[in-house]
Curated annotation (Swiss-Prot):
InterPro entries (UniProt xref): ComplSys_Reg/VirEntry_Med, Sushi/SCR/CCP_sf, Sushi_SCR_CCP_dom
Disulphide bond pairs: C23-C72, C55-C83, C87-C129, C114-C140, C147-C189, C175-C201, C208-C251, C237-C262, C269-C311, C297-C322, C331-C370, C359-C381, C389-C431, C417-C442, C449-C492, C478-C503, C507-C558, C541-C568
Protein name: Complement factor H-related protein 5
Glycosylation sites: N126, N400
Stored PANTHER family: COMPLEMENT FACTOR H-RELATED, COMPLEMENT FACTOR H-RELATED PROTEIN 5
SUPFAM superfamilies, alphabetized: Complement control module/SCR domain
Gene3D superfamilies named in the record: Complement Module, domain 1
Record Pfam families: Sushi
Span of the signal peptide: 1-18
Any one GO molecular function term: identical protein binding
Subcellular location: Secreted
Length: 569
């Protein structure tokens, strides 16, 4: 009985003493082990045992390697096996973020700045990458806002009259007692209030002299010596310059409204996009801003669209389409109140056919062309009233945009921020449906970055500059066989670059080590002497050697320049 008790006690002590030398079988949420089916998931693992694991789609290990090595130690698994959610960050419509286009990991927090009149869900300012994805969708949605009831000078009338005005509402002005309006004829309600300023009414107004000279630009029409109140002139910039601010100025009671500026455009366009079933005359980039190139379609193909594309601010305008002539669609005439001057044979028209027509209650004639099944312009007798937007608003912290000129639907105005302020994405406002849409914000920018950090065995894809404005990004690449770990781009934030990537060393298959361990490449025709980090190389024993019981796996994973070679005896 005493002997039996001693045996049980010794056995119990041995078990207790061995608890610290065993690891629980690794259970990895959103991950799996290499050759997982070969292991017993209910067994414990002895110290020194090595496993490799990978993560499911949209998840990654902290090292960001495809296969990550973990080792059972007396303290447990090292490193701790886990898979982190990857959250891709889109380009934010109606807002911006320095993280646009980047990948973030679970636990990261990102700041989003929405345009005026827009906000994140629940008015959040930051969103976090969590296991399910983004904590809040990275979408800037329209938010309701209000403007005060305007207090106007005597003899100024505003319509429509309401008890409250919402963001987007437009007020139109007129003068009583046959007085003359001085200032804008309409204003719009924005998140920051009414803009532009309200007008006044006067009995007499002064004329203006010739419009002022514009540096690197000129007036489009012939200049006069005198311009009447409310007369408008329009400017164009010289080649390689783009206009910022309202391109039209107006004579207002003897003074011209604010001039635009012409800014030299240094962004160039690269190779011309390939046109399916078409061609361009070959030439070598870069192409300067404003340069146009003619494109052509092959024989038996018809062009749909403009035959010229232009480099605008580093981007080519839209390519036309080349459609096979036998695939071109016909156009039809619809509408009982349309009278055409043609005998409508079957009421169908071939591509490029032109018609002249008039409507029942309108005497003047209209013209249209059939373009691949669609009339251009549309054959229509509905009277559409031309819509105008109020003068463009004075955006907070933007350069002076004071003007009293209305803009037609589709017209754009480029915005330029004051010094120390940055316009991260949208640089133009667009007049649409009689209102200015999606106003950008000028964000304070107190610090610039120097050249991007250098990395071992890698370089940037572009020539480094001496200074970079906040929000700038630079892309890296590694030398051949080196694997890039981390984000391929770095971003300038608060005078500092985000963490650059690393170029992980490749592995070189060593003949000396293979001979020493009595092994050879499993696939003799593989000829694989180099392997990137995360790549696998398979070995086998040389005849007549056999695998050692404690040998590492014969499918070796390259880990930052090192293989763990299997052993045969």
């Amino acid at each position: 009985m005493l002997l039996l008790f001693s045996v049980i006690l010794i056995s119990w002590v041995s078990t207790v003493g061995g608890e610290g030398t065993l690891c629980d079988f690794p259970k990895i949420h959103h991950g799996f082990l290499y050759d997982e089916e070969d292991y017993n998931p209910f067994s414990q693992v002895p110290t020194g045992e090595v496993f490799y694991y990978s993560c499911e789609y949209n998840f990654v290990s902290p090292s960001k390697s495809f296969w990550t090595r973990i080792t059972c130690t007396e303290e447990g698994w090292s490193p701790t096996p886990k898979c982190l959610r990857m959250c891709s960050f889109p380009f934010v419509k109606n807002g911006h973020s320095e993280s646009s286009g980047l990948i973030h990991l679970e636990g990261d927090t990102v700041q989003i700045i929405c345009n005026t009149g827009y906000s994140l869900q629940n008015n959040e300012k930051n969103i976090s990458c969590v296991e399910r994805g983004w904590s809040t969708p990275p979408i800037c949605s329209f938010t309701k806002g209000e403007c005060h009831v305007p207090i106007l000078e005597a003899n100024v009338d505003a319509q429509p009259k309401k008890e409250s005005y919402k963001v987007g509402d437009v007020l139109k002005f007129s003068c009583r007692k046959n007085l003359i309006r001085v200032g804008s004829d309409s204003v719009q309600c924005y998140q920051f209030g009414w803009s532009p300023n309200f007008p006044t009414c006067k009995g007499q107004v002064r004329s203006c002299g010739p419009p002022p000279q514009l540096s690197n630009g000129e007036v489009k029409e012939i200049r006069k010596e005198e311009y009447g109140h409310n007369e408008v002139v329009e400017y164009d910039c010289n080649p390689n310059f783009i206009i910022n601010g309202p391109k039209k100025i107006q004579c207002v009671d003897g003074e011209w409204t604010t001039l635009p500026t012409c800014v030299e455009q240094v962004k160039t366009c690269g190779y011309i996009p390939e046109l399916e079933y078409g061609y361009v005359q070959p030439s070598v980039p870069p192409y300067q801003h404003g340069v146009s190139v003619e494109v052509n379609c092959r024989n038996e193909y018809a062009m749909i669209g403009n035959n010229m594309i232009t480099c605008i601010n580093g981007i080519w305008t839209e390519l036309p389409m080349c459609v096979a002539t036998h695939q071109l669609k016909r156009c039809k005439i619809a509408g009982v109140n349309i009278k055409t001057l043609l005998k409508l044979s079957g009421k169908e028209f071939n591509h490029n056919s032109r018609i002249r027509y008039r409507c029942s209650d309108i005497f003047r004639y209209r013209h249209s062309v059939c373009i691949n099944g669609k009339w251009n312009p549309e054959v229509d007798c509905t009277e559409k009233r031309e819509q105008f937007c109020p003068p463009p608003p004075q955006i907070p912290n933007a350069q002076n945009m004071t003007t009293t000129v209305n803009y037609q639907d589709g017209e754009k105005v480029a915005v330029l921020c004051k010094e120390n302020y940055l316009l991260p994405e949208a640089k133009e406002i667009v007049c649409k449906d009689g209102r200015w849409q999606s106003l950008p914000r000028c964000v304070e920018s107190t610090a610039y970055c120097g050249p991007p950090p250098s990395i071992n065995n890698g370089d940037t894809t572009s020539f480094p500059l001496s200074v970079y404005p906040p929000g700038s990004t630079v892309t890296y690449r590694c030398q051949s066989f080196y694997k890039l770990q981390g984000s391929v781009t770095v971003t300038c934030r608060n005078k500092q670059w985000s963490e650059p990537p690393r170029c992980l060393d490749p592995c070189v298959v060593s003949e000396e080590n293979m001979n020493k361990n009595n092994i050879q490449l499993k696939w003799r025709n593989d000829g694989k002497l180099y392997a990137k980090t995360g790549d696998a190389v398979e070995f086998q024993c040389k005849f007549p050697h056999k695998a050692m019981i404690s040998s590492p796996p014969f499918r070796a994973i390259c880990q930052e320049g090192k293989f763990e070679y299997p052993i045969c005896e």
